[in-house]
Each structure stands twice: as C-alpha cells, then as structure tokens.
Amino acid sequence: MSVKVEKKTDSYLKDTIQKLLERSRESGSVFWRDIAIRLSSSRKNYATVNLGKLQRIASDDDIIVIPGYLLSSGVFNKKIKVSAFKISEKALKKLNDAGSEFVNLVDLASENPKGTNIKIIR
C-alpha cells in the first residue's frame, strides 16, 4: 500500500506524514507507518475523539495516539500522554488542567521510535 502524500494540500499534514514515514524507515517500525497511512487517507476517515471517550478507555500513565482530531466534549481527569494530528484549544486546556501532557505526533515518534506501549484510539 503506497502513501499518497503528494495529493494533500495542507503543508503541515504533508510534513507530518513524511516525517512519520522517515521515523518508520529509520527504526524499522510499522507502527508509525500505520499512523502515516491513516493520515494520508481521506479526512472523513480521520478519527475524531472526545475527551470523554479517553476518560472511559485510558488508564493513568497510558500513551495514546489519535490519528485525527481530539475534541473537548466530556469530563476528563486522568494523567496520560496524548498525541494527535490536531487538538482543539478547549481540549488542550482540559488536558493541562488534569495534569496530562499533549505531544506532537512527530515529537512522540522521536521519543518512541518503535512505538512500544502506545495505544491507538479511533
């Protein structure tokens, strides 16, 4: 399956996909390639996750990747590390108030090149 980056018009998205593919090739991990493939698909297929869903699914100290958008609906009070393509301002504020951490996808790929102990939420 090829990754069609050239069809994307958003430069931030193109850059993110290319950097995730580079990390995947460098580390030999298919995890970051899978995230890049999900981001290279149509936007209607992106994951849209609310904080309320993370509250139900995640445990404290989990590392969560969302190949799409993180929105602020719901109550949230867990201490986790979250990474997503985009996050709303309210969701970021709720995460910080709960003591959680938001990390860019590319930065998380640099921290954890193999993608071990990371959950993908859709």
Swiss-Prot record:
Record's keyword annotation contains Ribosomal protein: yes
Biological processes per GO annotation: translation
Matching SUPFAM superfamilies: Ribosomal proteins L15p and L18e
Top-rank taxon: Archaea
A GO-annotated cellular component: cytosolic large ribosomal subunit
InterPro entries: Ribosomal_eL18 (IPR000039), Ribosomal_eL18/eL18-A/B/_CS (IPR021132), Ribosomal_eL18_arc (IPR022947), Ribosomal_uL15/eL18 (IPR021131), Ribosomal_uL15/eL18_sf (IPR036227)
Coiled coil: none
Assigned keywords, A-Z: Ribonucleoprotein, Ribosomal protein
GO molecular function: RNA binding; structural constituent of ribosome
UniProt similarity note: Belongs to the eukaryotic ribosomal protein eL18 family.
NCBIfam families: PRK04005.1 (NF003079)
Name listed for the protein in its UniProt record: Large ribosomal subunit protein eL18
Organism of this sequence: Picrophilus torridus (strain ATCC 700027 / DSM 9790 / JCM 10055 / NBRC 100828 / KAW 2/3)
Organism lineage string: Archaea, Methanobacteriati, Thermoplasmatota, Thermoplasmata, Thermoplasmatales
